[in-house]
């Protein structure tokens, strides 16, 4: 019985620690944070509309995770652009993972637009990427760290055009929280069986 309690106690503690890191505690963007993030954003070459979107997104923080939907079109020659983008990605994703974010889906375009209804004609995408962020505050800190950095220059040099917008999940059948919970439970169950038998 004592062994059983220790095994499952450790499993519960491990998952709680993971949850605290991966989900966080709902820390929201403060007014001071907002001013710091926007001071950085306003130094870029983004349009006034994009800058306003950033401000609105940060100002209405709900403290929850979100996903950034990205569409990318590489410059020619694509091999050279792909290498530059990979350099940027390796650095950026490393910083993202430290803040409990990660790539959720990355894919290559298999055709030109199949549907384009009542919107500007934007076509010829090379790839798409869905990136998970723990919070808007994490995005802000990453922006401060990334804008005007050398690795951000790799991204700008690689892309002919890009399109991105944040989204919150209303249906997510591939939750990392559930996966990690199942893995920890499986390890605990196997450990219990091995030690008891």
Describe each PLM feature range.
Residues 123-139:
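Hydrophobic alpha-helical transmembrane segments
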Residues 2-125, 168-197:
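Short S/T/G/P-rich N-terminal loop/turn motif that feeds into the first structured element of a domain
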Residues 151-167:
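Conserved short beta-strand edge segments in small beta-sheet-based binding/regulatory domains
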């Amino acid at each position: 019985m004592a062994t059983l309690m220790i095994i499952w106690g450790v499993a519960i503690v491990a998952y709680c620690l993971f949850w605290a890191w991966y989900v966080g505690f709902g820390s929201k963007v403060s007014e001071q944070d907002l001013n710091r993030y926007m001071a950085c954003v306003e130094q870029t070459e983004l349009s006034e509309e994009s800058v306003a979107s950033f401000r609105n997104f940060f100002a209405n923080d709900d403290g929850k995770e979100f996903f950034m939907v990205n569409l990318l079109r590489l410059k020619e020659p694509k091999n050279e652009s792909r290498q530059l983008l990979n350099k940027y990605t390796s650095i950026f994703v490393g910083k993202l993972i430290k803040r409990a974010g990660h790539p959720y889906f990355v894919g290559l375009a298999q055709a030109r637009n199949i549907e384009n209804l009542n919107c500007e004609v934007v076509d010829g995408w090379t790839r798409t990427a869905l990136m998970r962020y723990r919070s808007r505050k994490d995005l802000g800190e990453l922006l401060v760290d990334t804008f005007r950095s050398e690795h951000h220059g790799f991204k700008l040099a690689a892309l002919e055009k890009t399109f991105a917008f944040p989204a919150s999940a209303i249906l997510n059948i591939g939750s990392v929280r559930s996966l990690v919970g199942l893995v920890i439970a499986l390890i605990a169950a196997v450990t219990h069986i091995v030690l008891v038998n």
